[in-house]
Design a protein with these regions (language model features):
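Conserved N-terminal/central alpha/beta ligand/cofactor-binding core
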Residues: 2-14, 23, 49, 55-56, ...
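Small-residue (primarily alanine) positions within well-ordered alpha-helices
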Residues: 46-51, 518-522
């Protein structure tokens, strides 16, 4: 069959018009049972929880991909030692199992890798399941697809909340702006869940919240300062993926601010920011990391166990998301390394409660730091093989992160606005040093569990790492419920933690558990015609709710395990 001739101009015009004519008639007002703003891990889990209970859900997301820190932010999952056995929800385990099965069904794995029960596609040291972000996107979409087909779930991407309508203390509706064309629409909802990365709904709804570092006077935390520091937040990072093709030159143009970042020498860093030296998070000793692309290690021999080691001394394998030797020879020319390292932590200025112009300017600075680190690796980094400086074969893999600019689609946000909650989790609830042999505090209103060391990155207030060993902990329902706003729930890093305890509640499986509990709570309140405060406040009502979430696959307490 020959090439198609160009159709008449009128046909071209009509072919465009039928695709765009409906835009003027698209609805600008929606109603739903539960509105979830933010399609990160907390938002997705909240949606799944509510949908399984038969509720209509409207889910919005600022970026093209659902999944937040796991996908658009490109961060492989930070998980605890026992993740393969217990300590996560049933649906989070389904997500993990789905990712592994996706590789087995669609990737040319070696037979040995395919048979491995605990397949780690990237053989990264940070997690037992390091993988390419697109795979998680596909699995999340598949988990939600039946509910879209049934009409229970509506998803709107590339939108952001801009205003709301309140009736007394109740959030009646939220208005969203479309990022592509500037249009707006409004969603009425009986319950509203804030699962955004920065707690966007809190200032919009005038829900009382906290930012930055609380004072010791307010929280009693031993690691807190004497005075509150509301502008002192953890660094944000814009991650990126690279591979390395020896003999080729993929050097990017020199970033405009490269000289600035090359000369940056933070007082507490003990070395230039761009380099292989940085403080050790647990000891603060200045340690030089290894960087050797494609070390040809055996993927099956990699041990990923945060209890034994953070895994970050070898930067290439730390967060590697594709180990080429897991795949049939010749398919991958190189491993793929995900760069989320101390050297790209942007801690010059905060990004919370600033103007939109300031936010974009600071994120641009964070991006320039990431590009500069890549350029340093390509040109100035001392080579481990002694062959001078620079690895020009390092290739930026924007195709892996879904962007033309090459970096991750979204910034990796470690800290959010946090609600003034019924319950605030504090350091002394779970710190090994404070608790001694007693284990973490048991919350009678537990709706989940989590575990990670309290891990705070350098901050905009000039603080170095704060790294505190802790016990496996519980998630109190009271931390998801604001003191005010009876139909608003928190479902991400915006729950009732502190600057310090957010450092262990912000990780992937914990955020998922928080979101799932929030979605189940909203659905339960609608089913029983109760408020969240009533469910938590009366023992019998809470027990009924807790029994339900346990049946839904949420673990609410730990077996006898030790902290680290």
């Amino acid at each position: 069959m020959g090439e198609l001739s160009e159709p008449p101009n009128g046909h071209v015009k009509n072919s465009v018009s039928w695709q765009t004519a409906h835009l003027k008639t698209r609805p600008k007002h929606f109603s739903t049972d539960i509105l979830i703003a933010g399609g990160g891990l907390g938002g997705v889990a909240a949606a799944l929880g509510a949908l399984r209970r038969g509720r209509h859900v409207f889910l919005t997301e600022e970026y093209d991909w659902l999944g937040g820190q796991l996908t658009s932010q490109a961060v492989p999952p930070d998980e605890h030692t026992w993740v393969e056995q217990f300590g996560v929800t049933r649906s989070y385990r389904a997500l993990r199992d789905g990712i592994r099965q996706y590789y087995r069904d669609n990737y040319p794995l070696t037979e040995e890798a395919r048979r491995r029960a605990q397949l780690n596609p990237g053989a990264g040291h940070v997690s037992k399941l390091c993988h390419e972000p697109r795979v998680a996107v596909a699995v999340i979409e598949a988990m939600l697809m039946p509910f879209i087909g049934s009409g229970l779930l509506t998803v709107k991407k590339r939108v952001k909340a801009v205003s709301c309508e309140m009736v007394g203390q109740v959030v009646r509706s939220v208005e969203f702006r479309k990022l592509d064309d500037g249009g707006t629409f409004t969603v009425d909802a009986k319950y509203v869940i804030d699962a955004t990365e920065l707690g966007d709904l809190l200032p919009i709804t005038k829900t009382p919240y906290v930012t930055g570092f609380e004072s010791r006077k307010d929280t009693g935390e031993p690691s807190a300062p004497e005075e509150a520091q509301p502008q002192n937040s953890q660094a944000v990072s814009i991650c990126f993926a690279v591979d390395h093709i020896e003999g080729e030159d993929h050097t990017i143009p020199k970033p405009e601010r490269y000289d600035h970042w090359r000369s940056c020498h933070p007082d507490f860093w003990g070395a230039p920011l761009l380099g292989l030296k940085a403080p050790h998070p647990r000891t603060l000793e200045i340690v030089e990391r290894e960087f050797t692309p494609n070390p040809n290690d055996d993927p099956a021999s990699v041990i990923s166990d945060q209890r034994k080691s953070g895994g970050d001394m070898n930067l290439w394998t730390f967060r590697r998301i594709a180990a080429k030797d897991n795949f049939i020879p010749g398919v991958y020319r190189s491993d793929i390394c995900l760069v989320n390292w101390p050297m790209i932590d942007y801690f010059e200025k905060p990004i919370i409660d600033v103007s939109e112009a300031e936010l974009q300017e600071r994120l641009a600075e964070a991006a320039s730091l990431s590009y500069s680190m890549l350029y340093y690796l390509q040109t100035d980094c001392p080579r481990a093989d002694g062959k001078g400086t620079g690895y020009p074969g390092l290739r930026l893999r924007g195709d892996i992160t879904g962007t033309e600019h090459g970096l991750a689609m979204a910034p990796y946000v470690r800290e959010s606005r946090r609600i003034e909650a019924i319950t605030t989790v504090v350091e002394q609830d779970l710190s090994l040093d404070v608790r001694g042999s007693k284990g973490a505090v048991h919350y009678p209103d537990s709706v989940g569990v989590g575990m990670y060391r309290i891990d705070l990155h350098p901050s905009t207030g000039g603080d170095n790492y704060i790294d505190v060993a802790c016990y496996p902990f519980e998630i109190p329902l009271g931390a998801l419920i604001p003191v005010e706003r009876p139909n608003l729930l928190a479902a991400s890093k915006n729950i009732g933690t502190t600057h310090i305890t957010n450092g262990c509640y912000r990780l992937h499986p914990v955020e998922w558990n928080i979101g799932e509990a929030a979605g189940l709570l909203a659905a339960h309140c609608l089913d029983k015609e109760l408020s969240p405060h009533e469910v938590r406040g009366k023992k019998q009502l809470f027990q009924e709710f807790q029994d339900m979430i346990i049946r839904e696959g949420i673990e609410t307490e730990w077996p006898d395990v030790s902290g680290y």
